[in-house]
Amino acid sequence: MSVAKANVVWVLDYLNNQLAMIVRSSHQASGIDFLTPDNYGQQVAYMNRPKGEVIQAHIHEPISRTLIGTQEVLYIRKGRIRVDFYESDRTYVSSMILGAGDLMLLSTGGHGFEVLEDIDMIEIKQGPFAEGRDKTRFLPEPHEIRYSDESPN
């Protein structure tokens, strides 16, 4: 299940928990648009600033934050990829296609990918990666995968 608003799509599980947020390359807004809720470990904001505007120099103060779990941000620089979304109990929810310029925040649940075209992709997440403790791999049922092969852009 998904909910879209102005080229921002929230992927929801069957209990309306947010599994992911996709910001399509065509998304636009005025000024600063904070897209994620305040309780997320990663904050995503869209900014539209005019030429010549000055953003005052600043530092980020060390603030203690407690994070449980891992949230990933993926930015697709080129190509296309299918993302399969799962609930935390590994129940398949839905799939979506991402293309060049799309950004996705994976907030909870599970996910898998199939590369549809050669991709260049950047991944951002809390680190460092805890090898052997950070993820549990599983084999989905291929017949469950449902998606439309429409170009996202």
Regions found by a protein language model. Give the residues of each.
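Short, surface-exposed beta-strand-loop junctions and turns on beta-sheet-rich folds
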Residues: 63-64, 89-91, 120, 128-130
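Glycine- and acidic-residue-biased ligand/ion/polar-headgroup-sensing regions
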Residues: 50-51, 69-84
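Conserved short histidine dyad/triad with adjacent acidic residue
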Residues: 29, 47-68
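Double-stranded beta-helix
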Residues: 112-153
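Short acidic-glycine-tyrosine-enriched beta hairpin
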Residues: 87-108
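Short beta-strand His + acidic residue motifs that chelate non-heme Fe in jelly-roll/DSBH
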Residues: 57, 83-84, 104-106, 111-116, ...
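A short, N-terminal "cap"/entry segment at the start of jelly-roll beta-barrel domains
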Residues: 1-47, 141, 149-153
